[in-house]
């Protein structure tokens, strides 16, 4: 059943001087029907690595499980975490191998090793690194916010507010995006940390945005 569900999704990842911040909203849609109001689209796949999903839910969930297993095996065998660029390459190669019967997904991989990284990966395995990236039907609205307000020297606190504003802008204009916002901060010190919903709600109110 999940293989038939498409997420009209908005996801975003940004790099800062010493962190990566990733965020998504929660609405899951099938054409014009809201199938789920609390879908999970933001995942920790390694100690210092996160992944967001957009596209067919079943395809995306399989890829998340696969990546978690591969990265855990790598860590157990080598006693180090896989570099973020290698994570993106592994996922890219896997998708490219099945490009004629593709996983219908758009993915972001973000994390920190010697420096922060965000990669956008398409269904054919195309992988592009950038200082920020967004996927899903709401991404044009996210890019509008990021183009005008992003600065890599933002503090982590300012970066969290920025991704919340970006996702909120998409929710206002994209009918396939909605619900609560999930945010994760990835640093060398603390690894992957997903912020509590209560903290996100408080920030949304402080910024004068609509829940």
UniProtKB/Swiss-Prot annotation:
Its EC number is 3.4.25.1. The active site is at 9 (nucleophile). SUPFAM superfamilies: N-terminal nucleophile aminohydrolases (Ntn hydrolases) (SSF56235). One of its GO terms (molecular function) is threonine-type endopeptidase activity. It is an enzyme of class 3 (hydrolase). Gene3D superfamilies: Glutamine Phosphoribosylpyrophosphate, subunit 1, domain 1. It catalyses: Cleavage of peptide bonds with very broad specificity. It is found in: Cytoplasm. The formation of the proteasomal ATPase PAN-20S proteasome complex, via the docking of the C-termini of PAN into the intersubunit pockets in the alpha-rings, triggers opening of the gate for substrate entry. Interconversion between the open-gate and close-gate conformations leads to a dynamic regulation of the 20S proteasome proteolysis activity. GO terms for cellular component: cytoplasm; proteasome core complex, beta-subunit complex. HAMAP family: Proteasome_B_A. PANTHER family: ATP-DEPENDENT PROTEASE SUBUNIT HSLV, METALLOPROTEASE TLDD. Belongs to the peptidase T1B family. This is Proteasome subunit beta. It comes from Thermoplasma volcanium (strain ATCC 51530 / DSM 4299 / JCM 9571 / NBRC 15438 / GSS1).
